[in-house]
Amino acid sequence: YMPIHVKVVTAEEYSKWVESEKKILAAKADDPTKVWTQNDLIARGEKVYAANCAACHQANGKGAGPIKPVDGSAVVLDADKSKMIAVMLNGQNNGAMPAWKQLSDTEIAAVMTYAKNSWSNKTGQLVQPADIKTARK
């Protein structure tokens, strides 16, 4: 026989509990030790780019005016991903390119992989969330 414990809570308490459970599930899904495939990173990165980067760098990666392009960028094309990671985490040009530390390790790895493999950037390179986690230390 298994005893059942029922806890009665208010609708507000229940909503808070549901939100906390969603955050726990999201954190597990974004486990920085998970090794992602290139296709999965690119698909996720496309969404991150559209939500956070396209406003300045344009959907086509070409940039506009003083905003530098991502398409064909030496930093993006460089096999040394530490340079692009530093830009993503710290920003550059006195804040013209903002830091994106608030994004998860998975989101940063995904958007970097997307940028490295979109438009004319066909590097075949990928960045794993563990790379971002290490760089944050």
Residue positions per predicted region:
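Flexible, glycine-rich surface segments
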Residues: D31-N60, A64-P66, V70-A74, A79
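Gly/Gly-Pro-rich "capping" loops immediately C-terminal to redox-active cysteine motifs
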Residues: M2-T10, Q58-L103
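Terminal connector regions
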Residues: Y1-M2, E21
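Flexible coil segments in periplasmic/lumen-exposed cytochrome c-class electron-transfer proteins
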Residues: A11-I42, E46-K47, A51, P98-K137
